[in-house]
Amino acid sequence: MTFAVNEAMRPGLRTGMRVMVQLGARKFYAGIVSRLHDEPPAYKTIKPIVRIVDEREAATPEQLRLWEWISSYYMCPPGMVMRAALPAKLKLDGYSEDETLRSGYRVPLVPHIGLHPAVGSEEQLHAVLDSLSRARTQHRAVVEYLARAGFLPGEEDDSRSPEASPAAQYPAGDLPDGEIPVGTPGKGGFAFGEAPLVPRAALGVSSAVIRALVERGILRQVDLERQPGGEDSFAVEGAVIAPLPVLTDSQQQAYEAIRSGFAGKEVVLLHGVTGSGKTEIYIHLMAERLAAGGNVLYMLPEIALTAQLIERMRGYFGDRVVVYHSRLSDNRRAEVYRELLASQGGRLVVGVRSSVLLPLPHLSLVVVDEEHENSFKQADSAPRYQARDTAVVLAGLCGAKTLLGSATPSMESYYNALCGKYVLVALTERYSGVSLPQVLLSDTLRAARRGEKRSHFNKLLLDRIEEALVRGRQVMLFQNRRGFSPFVECGNCGWTASCPDCNVTLTYHKSDGSLRCHYCGYHTPLPPRCPSCGADDLQPRGFGTEKIEEALAEIFPDAVIDRLDADTSRTAHGYRRIISAFERGQTDILIGTQMITKGFDFGNVSLVGILNADNLLNYPDFRAGERAFQLMMQVGGRAGRRSEQGAVVIQTGQPSHPVLAQVCSGDYEAMARMQLAERQSFLYPPYCRLISLTLRHRDRTLLWEAANRFGDSLRRVFGRRLLGPEAPPVDRIRGQYLVRFLLKIEKQSSAAEAKRLLAGLFDTLHRDKAYRAVELIPDVDPQ
C-alpha cells in the first residue's frame, strides 16, 4: 500500500523504518517502509503516515529483499511475512483510538505485570484499586495497562514495546522495597511468571499502590539476585575460550575441500556419516569467518538440539554466541533482534527455522545442520517457507556462503550436488574410528508365530536390552507416536473415541486419563463406560511412547526409564531435565519420538531399538522411502559413538523391503539412486516443482462444489499436471473441511507464471458470492 509523507517527516524517513498508519475510521497499524517513491498509485485517496515509530531502521535492506522473495515464491502476502519476521515486541497491532488516546494518555510501553490467579476479572481489580487512596488516576492507568497487555479484556492494542527491556537495565532501587517479578498471562486467569524488571515509575503508580496490591495478594514481591549469562543471554562472564578442536585427517581433508568449494560455488553440501564429526568442521569454518569480522548463522532443525550445542559453542566463542528460538521470552527475542540489527559483525547466531528471518548485516556464512529435516519447513501457517532454501537465498543476497550438512541429505540437495549446482564433499569415517553400528532386522510376524514376542518387543530386542543393561550401557528406543495408545475402542460394539472438530480418533494418554486430539488440542476424560452401548469394555489399541514406557517398566523393573516426546518436554525445564539425566548416566533407557533422532551425542549408548519400522515404510507419500531411511539411519547413529561398535535392532513385518536392506548396509547412494529413478519416472521433486492447494470451509457440500468448479478451471489451464481434487487423510481439522489439489510444474516451466495464473483463477472463483468464504491455502514445495 502507498501512503503520503509530509515534508516535515520526509528527511528522517528511510526504508526499513516502522511507521504508524490509519486504516478505517479508528484503526491504527504499524508497517515497514519498503520503498520511497513519487509515483502516484491508481487509487485517488492517499492517506498520510501518522508518525514514524523509530529513529532507526527496523529491517535491513537484505531483509526487505528476502521478505519480498518469500512473499512472491511462497504465495504469501508481504504483511504476513513481516509479522513472521518481527518479534512480538516489535509489532504494533491494530488498536482503536479511544478517549484515553485522544486525551494524550498512552499505555506504558513496558512488559506485563503478573497477577495472582485469584484476581480473575476486571471488576475485581477495579474494586480493589477503588478502595486505595489516590486510586482514581492510578486505577485507570493500571487497569488500562493490564487490559492492553492482554491480562484483562480490552480493545486491540499497540502496547507491545518497540524497545526491549532487559532485566539488567533497571537497578533494584528503582522499585519499592525490593524487586517485583513480571509475569505472563495464563488461560482463563493470571499466572505468576518471570520476565524483565520494570521501574515502578514507568507505570505511573505510587509505592502505596504497589504495597497495597502486594498485601491483598494481587502482586507478589520477590527479592531476586541478578544472574549473569544463561542460555539465552549474550555474554557469559568469565567464560573460558577453549582452543578449537583438532581435526582428524579425514576431517581436515573435508575442511579443505569445503573451502575450495566455496571458491567456485555459493553452496557446499557436506555428506558426513553419523558420528563423523561434522560439527568440528563447522566450528573451524565459523571461527575463520568470525575472525574476519563476519556474522555467521548456524541453523538447527529443533529447539531440542540447541541446549547441547550452545554450551559447546560458548566454550569456543564465548559472548559472540547469540541464541534465537521460540522458547525465549518476547523481551529476549526483541533484544536479540535489536542487537543483531546494530551488529558490526563477529556474531555467531544459533537458531532454528525462524532465525533465517533475523537481521544479519555483514553475514558471511550460513551453516544448515541436518539439512534434510522437514522441520525446516513451516507447515502450519503462512508464510509456509522452507528455511533451508530461504537460507540459501539469504546468503546469496548478502554475498555469503552456505554449507548444508547431513548424514542423509535430502533428495533435492543431493540432486543439486549431482547436477553441479552445489559442491559435494563426503566424510565417510567416524570421528573416533569406531565402525558404524551393526543393524539387525527382527521379523515381528515370525516372532509372533514362534511365541518370541512379549508385549511390543521381540525376543531379540529384549535380549539385547538386557545385555546392554548388564554391561552398564544405555539404550534408546524409537517409537514415532506419543501417548499411550492411538485410539480407544469398545470391545462390545466397536465404538471409537473421535474428536468432535477433526476427523481423527483421540489418542489415549494414561498419565492423566485423558483422550486428546493431536491436531486441534481438544481433550476430554476417558469415559468409564462406552457412550454408545454402555458396556464396561473400553480397550486401548495400538501403542505410543507412554505405553512402551509402562511395558518396559514391567519387564525391567530395576531399570531407570524416561520418555522424551512432546508431552514430557512441553517446557524447557522438562526437556533439560530429561536430557541432562540421560547424559549423566542417571537414566538407563530413553524412549522417544523423532526428537531423539536429531543429532544427540551420548557416549554410553550401545543399543538403539526401532519398534515399528512398518509405520515409516508404509506412509502414503512419495517421500516415504527417503524419510524412513533418514530416520532409521539418524536414530541408529546414536549408538556406539565412542569406543565400541553399537547395535541397532529394527522390528518389522517386511524384512525384505529394499529400504531396510539399504539401512542395513548403510548405503545412502543406493537409496538415492532408487528414489531418484522412481521420482523421475513419475515426475516428482527434484524433477519438478510442487504446489499444494488446499480449499477450506465449514460446509462440506459447498466446499466440494467450489473444489469441482475450481478444479475445472485449473484443469483447462494446467491439464494433466493437476492432481485432485481429493480429500486428505484427515479431511476435517478444527471444524473446517479440507479438499486438496497438487500441481506439478516442470523445471523448464515458469513457476512465477503458474502462480500468477493460480491467483487469477481463484479470484474468479471468489467473485461468486456463494464461494466467497472458501479459503485457499497455497503451499509451495510442500513437505
Which functions belong to the PLM regions below?
Residues 712, 716-737, 776-779:
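A carboxyl-terminal module marker
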Residues 698-700, 744-751:
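Helix N-cap motif at beta-to-alpha junctions
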Residues 242-248, 252, 264-704, 712, ...:
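Inter-lobe coupling/hinge segments of SF2-like helicase ATPases
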